[in-house]
Amino acid sequence: MAIANKNIIFVAGLGGIGLDTSREIVKSGPKNLVILDRIDNPAAIAELKAINPKVTITFYPYDVTVSVAESTKLLKVIFDKLKTVDLLINGAGILDDYQIERTIAVNFAGTVNTTTAIMAFWDKRKGGPGGVIANICSVTGFNAIYQVPVYSASKAAALSFTNSLAKLAPITGVTAYSINPGITKTTLVHKFNSWLDVEPRVAELLLEHPTQTTLQCAQNFVKAIEANKNGAIWKLDLGRLDAIEWTKHWDSGI
């Protein structure tokens, strides 16, 4: 997918990886970039507008833990204004295994709810034009950081959901792929809580190993958007972009 002249909705587009990805997207010249985030950041929005004044950038406050009905209301406002949306990026995430319910609500249920809401506008069974979904998951969806099992499980769930979305594309007209960053230097990983304090130094230990910058991750994210491969499981780690082949151990047969 060429980003130029496209209409893009980016959930959590002002976060660590999110903000650098928004910068890279804006450089590629979309028609509209609509950022949905829990906390407004006027300085970041102004910076994005300055990068490419030809791009219309709009911000709406949004908490992914709201109901599908509330998400649908907001999306209706956006669709009424833009008429068409080409790409939805689901990027909300938290890393704090003290907050069990919120971790699941943000990292998994939020992705499901926002995706479900946009289907009202995209599903070809309802006369919709289809669309593309990029879900930010994590390499912990492949293999857990076992000291944060709640976070890791929430990302594995989001990855499984995304894989199913891709297989449903012939029915819905909506394609999907997952973006799975490795350990990236953001505020998310500088200090966080392990489950039941099983490893108080988990953040410190992780950062002793090679990482990547948010810019490296963002640049590869844009490459994945441009590749636009339905069902792709992209690993964005150590400055590289690699497609992962999923090992099948069971098949429903239907």
From Swiss-Prot:
The active site is at Y151 (proton acceptor). Gene3D superfamilies: NAD(P)-binding Rossmann-like Domain. NAD(+) binds at residues 10-33. Substrate binds at S138. GO terms for biological process: alcohol metabolic process. One of its GO terms (molecular function) is alcohol dehydrogenase (NAD+) activity. Belongs to the short-chain dehydrogenases/reductases (SDR) family. This is Alcohol dehydrogenase 2. It comes from Drosophila hydei (Fruit fly). The lineage of its organism: Eukaryota, Metazoa, Ecdysozoa, Arthropoda, Hexapoda.
